[in-house]
């Protein structure tokens, strides 16, 4: 797209929102089946929406990922499905694999059509027998001459339809690989789509794909460089997980905006429920979850923009974002609206499966949490525990006993290295000091002082956790991989501590008192969960005061969020 970068970006983002707003206002967003209308997708293509992450050289906008993620939060307040499709298309679909791993020839061939929306894209990884366990993939591509012939079945593929372009993960000579595949406009014996009833993602196309000797040109194979096809897949998934967190922030803003009118209208025992502590607590806590998700989104997107792989950080954002959205939907939004939540046309009842589904797609939360933990301990295990195992193997010792002098002598080198680390850690931990951003030092505001306390708490907690992590590795040794419950639990606590640190640092740089108060409340609650304590009266006063401020319109950006009409209204006396 031509024009100055700033002008093009502003225009495309503004016009994309306008397209969605117009169709929402006219009631023309969905067709008779409840799917997004083709006209909507074309209109979005006309204004450059599908090229947000495509380089300008190929007709796209070339947004940074931070710009893209922040925009998704705004868009999700209008329509979360369209925001989700932007991620499917640009992150886990064909765009990111091509931009990152494609040759110049491949980019020139595919990206212009993806940028203008002539071809929309999807990501085909999951199979009937392979979800979290990607070693179970069965779809294969066999080369004959200048063509790969693909045979296999994919499942739960969002945004797939005839005539679209997919990133296909398959096995080539037993190794995972990624092919860019232009699906034909019509189904055939070689390619067909498999429909099924699906509660979630009801406004998008989500189907299975069955291939039988389906031809794909050899030149459509992406080169991962170091690694294999899963390297390509994870690169896109990292971005998709950040986008999920950004989407969750927008969806929760929509929930909060639609809690307020009902809380003002509904009266119990002569007073509007907006005056009740429980409702105020729900609104205050929801605001905290929103700020935490926005903090995680900015943090992880910034890391990706700086060139970091960010896999562990993106996992934290995905898990927290999806779990926060689930908690917000069930514990805060539904309970405030009561029975009306289940009426046709209610935001909760119509979308409850979409509110819950992010806990599963792009990696189920606890499975991802274990992957996070394994990545976290990998270097420590390699440095200290692997040498112990190698020494035992060399000496043929199967059941080590440190009371046996020969065993102790065989392990003297590796054990000494570990002992130095352990003693040094125990000695230095109480004396560690942490340097925090200048904003903390310069401000005397109570909000900043409390946020500094949260940041210091989480930093110290994470430092201390190194001993618990190492102790867990020492206790279970080679059986650690089978101790899934312990790994998931410890991983979850580490993730919460990171969320506290990121949220407190993010809010301290924010100049809005309500944002800082929301961050303070959610950090306080997450610290309580980490410590296993009970909520204090001070916390209840803090979160309900925040809820009162939100009910009076003081949460930034909420006035721009659509509010649905009340269902089954009545005359208040």
Regions found by a protein language model. Name each.
Residues 1-89, 102-120, 132, 144, ...:
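Amphipathic, small/basic residue-rich leader segments at the start of a protein or domain
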Residues 48, 312-417, 513-573:
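Alpha-helix capping/hinge segments and adjacent helical runs
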Residues 147, 151-191:
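A short core secondary-structure module
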Residues 185-187, 209-240, 256-275, 298, ...:
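A glycine-rich, basic-preceded beta-loop-alpha segment at the flavin cofactor/substrate interface
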Residues 187-213:
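Flexible, small-/acidic-enriched active-site or ligand-binding loops
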Residues 260-261, 278-305, 497-506:
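Loop-to-helix element that buttresses phosphate recognition and phosphoryl-transfer chemistry
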Residues 265-281, 508-513:
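Terminal amphipathic helices with adjacent charged low-complexity linkers/tails
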Residues 409-573:
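C-terminal amphipathic alpha-helical interaction region
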């Amino acid at each position: 797209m031509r024009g100055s970068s700033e002008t093009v970006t502003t225009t495309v983002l503004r016009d994309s929102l306008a397209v969605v707003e117009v169709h929402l206002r006219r009631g023309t967003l969905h067709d008779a089946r409840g799917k997004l209308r083709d006209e909507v997708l074309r209109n979005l293509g006309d204004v450059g929406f599908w090229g947000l992450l495509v380089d300008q050289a190929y007709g796209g906008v070339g947004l940074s990922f931070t710009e893209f993620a922040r925009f998704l939060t705004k868009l999700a307040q209008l329509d979360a499905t369209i925001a989700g499709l932007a991620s499917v298309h640009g992150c886990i679909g064909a765009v990111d694999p091509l931009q990152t791993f494609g040759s110049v020839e491949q980019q020139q061939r595919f990206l212009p059509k993806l940028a203008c929306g002539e071809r929309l894209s999807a990501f085909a990884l999951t199979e009937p027998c392979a979800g979290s366990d990607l070693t179970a993939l069965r779809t294969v591509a066999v080369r004959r001459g200048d063509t790969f012939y693909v045979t296999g079945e994919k499942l739960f593929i969002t945004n797939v339809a005839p005539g679209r372009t997919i990133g296909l993960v398959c096995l080539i000579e037993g190794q995972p690989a990624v092919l860019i595949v232009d699906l034909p406009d019509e189904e055939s014996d070689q390619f067909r789509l498999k429909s099924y009833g699906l509660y979630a993602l009801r406004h998008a196309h989500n189907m299975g794909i069955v291939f039988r000797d389906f031809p794909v040109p050899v030149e459509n194979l992406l080169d991962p460089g170091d690694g294999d096809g899963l390297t390509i897949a994870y690169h896109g998934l990292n971005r998709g997980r950040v986008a999920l967190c950004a989407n969750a922030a927008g969806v929760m803003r929509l929930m909060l905006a639609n809690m307020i009118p009902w809380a003002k209208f509904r009266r119990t025992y002569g007073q509007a429920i907006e005056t009740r502590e429980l409702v105020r607590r729900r609104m205050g806590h929801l605001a905290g979850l929103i700020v935490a998700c926005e903090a995680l989104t900015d943090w992880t997107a910034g890391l990706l923009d700086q060139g970091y792989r960010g896999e562990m950080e993106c996992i934290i954002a995905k898990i927290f974002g999806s779990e926060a959205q689930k908690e917000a939907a069930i514990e805060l939004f539904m309970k405030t609206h009561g029975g009306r939540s289940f009426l046709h046309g209610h935001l909760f009842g119509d979308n409850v499966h979409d509110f819950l589904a992010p806990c599963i797609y792009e990696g189920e939360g606890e499975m991802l949490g274990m992957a996070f933990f394994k990545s976290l301990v990998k270097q420590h295990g390699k440095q200290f525990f692997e040498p112990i195992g190698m020494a035992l193997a060399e000496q043929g010792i199967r059941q080590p006993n440190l009371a046996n002098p020969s065993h102790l002598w065989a392990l003297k080198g590796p054990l000494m290295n570990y002992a130095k680390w352990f003693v040094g850690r125990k000695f230095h931990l109480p004396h560690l000091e942490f340097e925090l951003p200048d904003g903390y030092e310069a401000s005397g505001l109570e909000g900043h002082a409390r946020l500094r306390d949260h940041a210091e708490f989480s930093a110290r907690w994470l430092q201390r956790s190194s001993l618990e992590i190492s102790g867990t590795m020492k206790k279970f040794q080679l059986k650690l991989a089978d101790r899934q419950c312990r790994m998931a639990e410890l991983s979850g606590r580490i993730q919460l501590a990171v969320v506290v640190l990121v949220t407190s640092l993010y809010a301290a740089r924010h100049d809005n008192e309500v944002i800082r108060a929301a961050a303070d409340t959610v950090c306080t609650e997450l610290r309580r969960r980490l410590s296993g304590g009970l909520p204090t009266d001070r916390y209840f006063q803090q979160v309900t005061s925040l809820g009162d401020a939100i009910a009076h319109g003081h949460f930034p950006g909420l006035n721009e969020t659509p509010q649905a009409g009340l269902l089954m209204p009545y005359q208040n006396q």
